[in-house]
Regions:
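Extracytoplasmic/lumenal domain signature
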Residues: 1-203
Length: 203
């Protein structure tokens, strides 16, 4: 297809069709029919190609990480780009958004910041308000059953950080190696992490 898709896993739309991001110069999001493989639509991404993960909210809105300092795009299930981008001016890199049951979107930026947005694209909070937690250019946030947000970071502050749903820090765990993965949460609420040093960590 000529589609450039490093770091980008397909996602399923609310009606079960396949979503693919294109990181190339003609950066776009494609929807493909799940039964036939036929392309249903292709929409050029605003301000940069799809550079990282695609996540779909309960309302069917598609969120995709954009290349450059363009944040995350929002696209309807019918392929219409919505305004505004989430976090324009920040670098999304190869990061996946997390979306809660209320439609709030939690994203991480390469600059070492986590931010939350409502389902209309309005920023609710960001942490830290200034400075950095450590580079976040892979993986992304995960949401626990109680609404806690977990994210792993890289140098200069390789760590796992837990944030409240309102954006306040609950705790952090310093890692011996960088973390470039999304935390996984088991049925007991334990946090599972793999770091770049080959360590498997349970918190």
């Amino acid at each position: 297809t000529g589609t450039n898709i490093p770091y980008i896993s397909p996602a399923l739309s609310r009606d079960g069709n396949i979503l693919i991001g294109n990181r190339g110069t003609d950066g776009s999001v494609h929807m493909v029919d799940r039964s036939s493989g036929r392309q249903l639509w292709r929409r050029k991404s605003p301000n940069g190609g799809a550079n990282g993960g695609i996540s779909v909210g309960q309302n069917g809105v598609i969120h995709s990480a954009l290349s450059g300092a363009n944040g995350f795009a929002r696209t309807t299930q019918d392929g219409v780009n919505l305004s505004p981008n989430l976090g324009k001016g920040n670098t999304a890199a190869a990061v996946y958004p997390a979306i809660d049951a209320q439609g709030n979107v939690y994203v991480a930026f390469s600059e070492g910041v986590v931010a939350a947005y409502d389902n209309q694209g309005n920023e609710l909070w960001r942490y830290p308000a200034s400075g950095t937690m450590g580079k976040i250019d892979q993986g992304g946030p995960a949401i626990g059953a109680d609404g806690t947000i977990y994210v792993g970071t890289k140098n200069p502050n390789a760590q796992v950080v837990a944030l409240t749903k309102g954006g306040a820090k609950k705790w952090s765990y310093s890692s011996v190696a960088e973390i470039g993965t999304t935390p996984a949460i088991d049925s007991d609420g334990n946090i599972h992490i793999c770091d770049d040093g080959g360590n498997y960590i349970i918190l």
